[in-house]
From Swiss-Prot:
Keyword presence, Transferase: yes
PROSITE patterns assigned: TRANSKETOLASE_1
Reaction equations catalysed: D-glyceraldehyde 3-phosphate + pyruvate + H(+) = 1-deoxy-D-xylulose 5-phosphate + CO2
Keywords tagged on the record: Isoprene biosynthesis, Magnesium, Metal-binding, Thiamine biosynthesis, Thiamine pyrophosphate, Transferase
Name of protein: 1-deoxy-D-xylulose-5-phosphate synthase
Alphabetical GO biological process terms: 1-deoxy-D-xylulose 5-phosphate biosynthetic process; isopentenyl diphosphate biosynthetic process, methylerythritol 4-phosphate pathway; terpenoid biosynthetic process; thiamine biosynthetic process
Cofactor note: Binds 1 Mg(2+) ion per subunit.
Co-factor(s): Mg(2+); thiamine diphosphate
Matches recorded under HAMAP family: DXP_synth
Species assigned in the record: Anaeromyxobacter dehalogenans (strain 2CP-C)
Length: 636
């Protein structure tokens, strides 16, 4: 007998499956997700924990007329399998394959594109309001999980949804985990309520009482009055009911039959409803369930039998690990240094700091705005905070960077992990914009290390600097250079790392880790008789205009390279400097290489760098074109 999953090419096919067979279908989905994530990597734990919710929703609601909005998107793998993408699922997170997150262009069933947390309620409310305005039929469901309720925007959405009173269903997928274990008073409150003997005993007694009393309007009125008076003291739902939602739960998020019955009832309920489902992240796969740190959150390739990562050939340490070690050294030597992250202790490497300095390491939850202003408050009182955060997530705290930190010239260090192209996570997670959006902030020092030692020096420099500073470094391994003791760099001073005797043909100014590709291109061009100098600017702001302009004038041709967006980025900073120094009027030839004005899709990082034209081959080609173009015009 074939798999049930093989008979499902759309949600309409799923509706034909008897409810009694849904548990078997859920098991088939889990097996396929595990096998695929072992090969491709991905968000295993969240997707395994939400299988029954996915199946029950699609069994009851009619997508795409009914809109299912997934928060973050980590838990939507089963959704993809049930909406016509079963055969393509093996390609997820690979070049030319399915995206790792819901994307509107990929399927009509992906109602809203996601990748960052806490957006589902607001988006879903907008959709249900649009249906009211246009008269279009259909329900809207927001599935909020992975700790997204620790994000402030989720409560902003709840607040308006409760006020408007529309027929919005919010499913709270409560697995007590975000990427790392949930933190904060709200999470602690939920945990205590569910663990409370009083709470669980009260629920049992109420159920027994309801089954024993006579039915009738008068009896029901008395019961309702008693329950409402009591539940404010013992149920977690009072928080959501205070925001105008009807609260249902908590229910077993792995009882697919029970979920189907519940969704059928809630589909016809009038007004905003929040269904609280208790799930286990990594459900059905022991290695993920037993991983207390992340429950199989974002895994690379792993062995299905053991759950352990497939070991690659030994190589250099990842920049994330090097940063974490360097930060721990700084915290050991300076008690004023503290570390802050937004639900990313594991991802940013700060788990090492948390283990060694638990009282000086803060995980604030998915609350990037709060993280930055919290750091500002610490800095006001003489503390040296380091905010470690993925580049893509710092975008959420841009106003706080400007208003709360830079405007007050506070000594906050921003450590931006995943700066540049990130690979399989794709469009929503590319760190493409940080150089541009930070370069324009007055008084902020912006650094891009080219290797491990430069990262160590820049972190140390930022902690000695009496003002805001940021350093951004890429995903992946370093260059494998021998480590040096950290030292203070002179702010605003770059370095000439490759010189040539006499007059060079081209000067390449390569920001950050693009330096390696620039040096490789220079070596290849030397074999062709093209003399290339290479500058490591170190600082994107303040720029070493004296060095860069001198080398550009010397060569009369310059290529800038950055793993960031061209619009407003490092190359633009160089152009502005060339203009100020009159080099453009003097005929300086310039080529800027970087990420073009588009969102870069998922693939291996090396392929992405080739796509956008910042690998060694592309740099060499730009130099050849610049030399050939100017020689063709008779310019030396």
């Amino acid at each position: 007998m074939g798999r049930l999953l093989d008979t499902i090419d759309s949600p309409a096919d799923l509706k034909k499956v008897p409810v009694e067979q849904l548990p078997a279908l859920c098991q088939e989905i889990r097996e396929l997700i595990i096998q695929t994530c072992a090969r491709n990597g991905g968000h295993l734990g969240s997707s395994l924990g939400a299988v029954e919710i996915n199946v029950a929703l699609h069994h009851v609601f009619a997508s795409p007329q009914d809109k299912l909005v997934w928060d973050v998107g980590h838990q939507a793998y089963a959704h993809k399998l049930l909406t016509g993408r079963r055969d393509a699922f093996r390609t997820i997170r690979t070049e030319g394959g399915l995206a790792g997150f819901p994307e509107r262009h990929e399927s009509a069933h992906d109602a809203f594109g996601v990748g960052h947390a806490s957006t589902a309620i607001s988006a879903a409310l907008g959709m249900i309001e649009a249906k009211r305005v246009t008269g279009e039929p259909g329900k809207v469901v927001a599935v909020v999980g992975d700790g997204a309720m620790t994000g402030g925007v989720a409560f902003e959405g709840l607040n308006q949804a409760g006020y408007l009173g529309r027929n919005l269903l919010v499913v709270l997928n409560d697995n007590e985990m975000s990427i790392s274990p949930n933190v904060g008073a709200l999470s602690e409150w939920f945990s205590k309520k569910f663990a409370s003997r009083t709470y669980n005993r009260w629920r049992r007694q109420v159920k027994e009482f309801l089954e024993s009393v006579p039915k009738g309007p008068e009896a029901i009125g008395i019961i309702r009055h008693g329950i409402n008076a009591t539940k404010a003291l013992v149920t977690p739902g009072i928080l959501f009911e205070g925001l105008g939602f009807h609260y249902v739960g908590p229910v077993d998020g792995h009882d697919v039959k029970g979920l189907v019955e519940t969704f059928q009832k809630l589909a016809v309920f009038d007004g905003p409803v929040l269904l609280h489902a208790i799930t286990t992240k990594g459900k059905g796969y022991h290695p993920a369930e037993s991983d207390k740190a992340t429950r199989g959150h974002g895994l690379s390739f792993f062995d299905v039998a053991t759950g352990k990562p497939v070991k690659k050939s030994p190589g250099a340490k990842a920049y994330t690990d090097l940063f974490a070690e360097a930060l721990c050294e700084e915290m050991e030597h300076d008690p004023r240094v503290v570390a802050i992250t937004a639900a990313m202790l594991e991802g940013t490497g700060l788990i090492k700091a948390k283990q060694r300095f638990p009282d000086r390491t803060y995980d604030v939850g998915i609350a990037e705005q709060h993280a930055v202003t919290f750091a500002a408050g610490l800095a006001c009182e003489g503390i040296r905070p380091v905010v470690a955060i993925y580049s893509t997530f710092l975008q959420r705290a841009y106003d706080q960077i400007i208003h709360d930190v830079a405007l007050q010239k506070l000594p906050v260090t921003f450590a931006l992990d995943r700066g540049g192209l990130v690979g399989a996570d794709g469009k929503t997670h590319q760190g493409a914009f940080d150089l541009a959006y930070l370069r324009c902030v007055p008084g902020l020092v912006l650094m891009a290390p080219s290797d491990e030692n430069e990262l160590r020096h820049m972190l140390h420099t930022s902690l000695q600097h009496d003002g805001p500073a940021a350093l951004r470094y890429p995903r992946g391994a370093g260059e494998g250079v021998p480590l040096e003791p950290a030292r203070v760099l002179e702010i605003g001073k770059g370095r000439l790392v490759r010189n040539v005797p006499g007059k060079p043909d081209v000067c390449v100014v390569a920001a950050g880790t693009t330096l390696k590709a620039a040096l490789a291109a220079a070596e290849a061009l030397a074999a062709e008789g093209v003399a290339v100098t290479v500058v490591d600017p170190r600082f994107v702001k303040p720029l070493d205009e004296a060095l860069i302009c001198a080398e550009a004038a010397r060569a009369k041709r310059v290529v800038t390279v950055e793993e960031g967006c061209l619009a407003g980025g490092f190359g633009t900073a160089c152009l502005e400097a060339f203009e100020r120094h009159g080099l453009l009027e003097a005929g300086l030839g310039v080529r800027r290489l970087g990420i073009p004005d588009e969102f870069i899709t998922h693939a291996e990082q090396a392929k992405q760098r080739a796509w956008v034209g910042i690998d060694a081959e592309a740099i060499a080609a730009a130099c050849r074109a610049l030399v050939g173009d100017r020689k063709a015009r008779g310019v030396a």
